[in-house]
């Protein structure tokens, strides 16, 4: 078992990483929550696989448990889904002394966290991430949000969980497409902060070799994010480097209506494209983009896309949350493991 402590001024919490942790979720929940009711927010796929077993595991610790399930996919992370969830919480008579659990990938984590931050002006919640992307990235750091038609994560807040429980074995039920999706974020961490992690990923013979070491990979990624979040909780400085590849990635997701490319796939394309642009402008060491593209391809990730409507891309980029005071903060690399913030304008991409 590995435990990381996220130390923040107003709230600190543990990230627990252990194989077969799902058999002990109830016990761990009891260490941070002494209320009565627990509402689990999940999606239909995960509910079919884990819902009943995890519900019983938590009930065995004396809690009253209700499971609320939504349709899988990014389109559930929207305002139209919220009233149904809020009403089910009201029917369950959930109070501010109770608990919400986010059981799922990045979409469920963002959605359930947003619900927890807004229902009754705030209810405690726990993250139980089940996808690789959520385990290495979105479950840690307190960002919760829903999407608007005009862009991703445009309405949200910073709302940290009481606890993050990560069972790497739960990745065994993940479709290969979504394992690859998470690898996009894993590679991102190597790019921005850890040359050692990047070289470790280069050194694995294949994806199966990586999977055998997945617990350690998850720990390394969470530790990098922990350090960055502790230094810049509200995303006004260093934390922006976690968005390497995301400016173009979010634009790609939006242009393709969140259907063609998953988040990690879009970020992978964004990392490759931005690195090539930066090399052309002598802002990144020559050869860096080639290494990134090679590693992305090694793990089955797309590296390029044809954006026919540049106007759509431009508008999506303008809505990027790293834009401050009319300027666009783009995340670039000096070299592998050395991310930095580059202040520019949207014309950078033209």
Curated annotation (Swiss-Prot):
Gene3D superfamilies: 3.40.50.1970, Dehydroquinate synthase-like - alpha domain (1.20.1090.10)
A biological process from GO: chorismate biosynthetic process
Disulfide bonds: none
Intracellular or extracellular location(s): Cytoplasm
Primary localization: cytoplasm
Top EC group: lyase
EC number: 4.2.3.4
Annotated SUPFAM superfamilies: Dehydroquinate synthase-like
Pfam families the UniProt entry points to: DHQ_synthase (PF01761), DHQS_C (PF24621)
Residues that hold NAD(+) according to the record: 106-110, 130-131, 143, 152
Residues bound to Zn(2+): 185, 246, 263
Cofactor (UniProt): Co(2+); Zn(2+); NAD(+)
Keywords in alphabetical order: Amino-acid biosynthesis, Aromatic amino acid biosynthesis, Cobalt, Cytoplasm, Lyase, Metal-binding, NAD, Nucleotide-binding, Zinc
Pathway, per record: Metabolic intermediate biosynthesis; chorismate biosynthesis; chorismate from D-erythrose 4-phosphate and phosphoenolpyruvate: step 2/7
NCBIfam families per UniProt: aroB (TIGR01357)
Function in brief: Catalyzes the conversion of 3-deoxy-D-arabino-heptulosonate 7-phosphate (DAHP) to dehydroquinate (DHQ).
UniProt cross-references to PANTHER family, sorted A to Z: 3-DEHYDROQUINATE SYNTHASE, 3-DEHYDROQUINATE SYNTHASE, CHLOROPLASTIC
Protein name (Swiss-Prot/TrEMBL): 3-dehydroquinate synthase
UniProt source species: Clostridium perfringens (strain ATCC 13124 / DSM 756 / JCM 1290 / NCIMB 6125 / NCTC 8237 / Type A)
